[in-house]
Amino acid sequence: MSDRIDRDVINALIAGHFADPFSVLGMHKTTAGLEVRALLPDATDVWVIEPKTGRKLAKLECLDSRGFFSGVIPRRKNFFRYQLAVVWHGQQNLIDDPYRFGPLIQEMDAWLLSEGTHLRPYETLGAHADTMDGVTGTRFSVWAPNARRVSVVGQFNYWDGRRHPMRLRKESGIWELFIPGAHNGQLYKYEMIDANGNLRLKSDPYAFEAQMRPETASLICGLPEKVVQTEERKKANQFDAPISIYEVHLGSWRRHTDNNFWLSYRELADQLVPYAKWMGFTHLELLPINEHPFDGSWGYQPTGLYAPTRRFGTRDDFRYFIDAAHAAGLNVILDWVPGHFPTDDFALAEFDGTNLYEHSDPREGYHQDWNTLIYNYGRREVSNFLVGNALYWIERFGIDALRVDAVASMIYRDYSRKEGEWIPNEFGGRENLEAIEFLRNTNRILGEQVSGAVTMAEESTDFPGVSRPQDMGGLGFWYKWNLGWMHDTLDYMKLDPIYRQYHHDKLTFGMLYNNTENFVLPLSHDEVVHGKKSILDRMPGDAWQKFANLRAYYGWMWAFPGKKLLFMGNEFAQGREWNHDASLDWHLLEGGDNWHHGVQRLVRDLNLTYRHHKAMHELDFDPYGFEWLVVDDKERSVLIFVRRDKEGNEIIVASNFTPVPRHDYRFGINQPGKWREILNTDSMHYHGSNAGNGGTVHSDEIASHGRQHSLSLTLPPLATIWLVREAE
């Protein structure tokens, strides 16, 4: 008889409490010879089969009626390839034994994963189609170092955790198993007995696709092919490029009118992409599309960082959408959320029964504002999971930029916390040093591995050097959202024009710090929710004045140094706040030509004009690219400045933020000659009053504002005009 398997071991295996199934199951050399053991619940008969001939080599004895079989193979001494013929419910099935295969993860991969320096952990962890010893199937790997047992359960094994317990690689805390026959399209999860002895079902942190909510299973889905970065896409992200971003929530941009259901990724490719291109935008920014359980989070509480949400279609459908955007000349920015994750039990929270991905102390690991958990960036495997995710979206989907959400909440330990609710760092400070290092490391790796892709930070404080290189002490982002500019200018615009003279500095203050960062000027989704009103509705006055104010503001914004970002609906002056459960108010553009059409035409013309003239974008972050001509006329709420390109070509921008037209308004200029009006937000084309300067105006050799030559203009009411100097 063979080496006897202890009854306690059999009981533990069947109960799912045995942590080392490979030490028992599969083929083993024993004193009696070569022995095969299998755990096959509900099986009645099991034979060992010679694959080449189909010959039955031995029948396994049922040692436990719950499905434990064992038997010695006669006349065999060395390990060989075999299959099992298993009879279930009177039907014979030929299967490959998962427990005859050796370790899956290579030593170098295991070492890099443990060190947290594996550039692409998603190529090893998760579910991957594979062929081993001529057998096709799927290899599964999951990091859960404190679990007592982990099994793969899914459609291929009746969701029975007894059937496929995994091998623990103790050196890395990773559990692994190759399951023959498991294939793309099948659902799976990890069933584990956690560190506390509780039975848990967990989705795969590295799942590349997932079920549609409210279901939570992962989907076997191979890695997508890498997307080549083109020189055109790289160039479109550069500091001197025109960048005008259309920020979109895919679930509410437009919906089916008959049932209010979302458009699919492919429908969005056919509708959203050509619309954004026609409007003249250069980039699409998508609110998070990572899988998330709660629609009301807008994607900012993700549970599946590696899986595009199934709300709008499959992973391949999302790839189709990205490809369509690129074909239309649009770069794609993805909102990325490495700052926190939800508490849902099926996901990362207490993954193996311990605080594996999060901090154990709620003063470090819990966001009371959002009821979410904070990643433990100091744990190597966690930061590796996140850095790898950033690279994954860029390499495997062709994402051109990542906009990192809520950076301030990551880099400050006392973010939104009272005294006593946070733990200082090792030096007694408030900075989260591990998060800062994580962000720097992410930006460094992206710069090295996918040069041309960029990152943008939503950072709401004055933390120094967010968009400065790391060798200068910065975080290494390419761009930073200028939330201060946004708040100041919106606070100014909501004032009745009669009071604006007392708040003139709200429009000028931004230039005092403009060159400290590489700024994006954002009118984002955050400004049209939670009772803040729409941008249009914040403007003072009657309907005519509201639209005129908005047009003047857009003209100012597109001319001011910094890249542009506009949330969907603002391009046609939607009057309501954004509702993530409904379509934008496209009906405002139905019927006859109206004020909303005027704003839409203006935004399109702003984009096209801004892109055409290098002076409006080439030197956004160089002091030479901007100069005030009139900065102190607060009594009349007039501001005039010059934008300049590398060759010295200038565009004059003049704004009048009162409803009083200013006739014969004289100001000094640098370059005498004939100036042509290339944009006037008061144009009749945009439903303005059509005041202006008749197309062109000549300078006079009359000194003004310390300059020898000057222009005398009509400044339309509540309007911004752009003028370019005609060639001699």
UniProtKB/Swiss-Prot annotation:
Keywords: Carbohydrate metabolism, Glycogen biosynthesis, Glycogen metabolism, Glycosyltransferase, Transferase. GO terms for molecular function: 1,4-alpha-glucan branching enzyme activity; cation binding; hydrolase activity, hydrolyzing O-glycosyl compounds. Disulfide bonds: none annotated. One of its GO terms (cellular component) is cytosol. Pathway: Glycan biosynthesis; glycogen biosynthesis. The keyword Glycosyltransferase applies. Its EC number is 2.4.1.18. It comes from the Bacteria. The active site is at D405 (nucleophile), E458 (proton donor). It holds the Pfam family Alpha-amylase_C. SUPFAM superfamilies: (Trans)glycosidases (SSF51445), E set domains (SSF81296), Glycosyl hydrolase domain (SSF51011). It catalyses: Transfers a segment of a (1->4)-alpha-D-glucan chain to a primary hydroxy group in a similar glucan chain. Belongs to the glycosyl hydrolase 13 family. GlgB subfamily. Monomer. Catalyzes the formation of the alpha-1,6-glucosidic linkages in glycogen by scission of a 1,4-alpha-linked oligosaccharide from growing alpha-1,4-glucan chains and the subsequent attachment of the oligosaccharide to the alpha-1,6 position. This is 1,4-alpha-glucan branching enzyme GlgB. The gene is glgB.
